[in-house]
């Protein structure tokens, strides 16, 4: 594993929390469909794996949100990338805080 990515997708849906959640849920399902280790949080979803695959997933998230019916989407991405591998895993970063 040479990368981890935290992604927050914000569909441009006004005053409709149910619709916003539905679209975000579709994006999360898309992310999970790749079978990578994924942690869903209240503000962002974190995934780890190969950098190139993660970038493809990030690019696809916007398309999934648009296809799900939102007219526009803002996406915030945090990336940790170490070409030689051995980035800290999600579990190494947070497991001590979730006991």
Positions of PLM-derived features:
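Charge-rich, low-complexity N-terminal segments
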Residues: 1-99
């Amino acid at each position: 594993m040479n990368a981890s990515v935290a992604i927050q997708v914000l569909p441009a849906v006004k005053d409709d929390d149910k619709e916003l959640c539905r679209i975000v849920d579709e994006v999360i399902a898309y992310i999970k469909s790749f079978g990578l280790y994924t942690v869903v949080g209240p503000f962002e979803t974190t995934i780890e794996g190969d950098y190139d695959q993660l970038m493809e997933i990030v690019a696809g998230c916007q398309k999934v949100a648009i296809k799900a019916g939102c007219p526009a989407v803002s996406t915030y991405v945090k990336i940790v990338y170490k070409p030689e591998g051995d980035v800290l895993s999600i579990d190494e970063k947070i497991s001590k805080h979730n006991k």
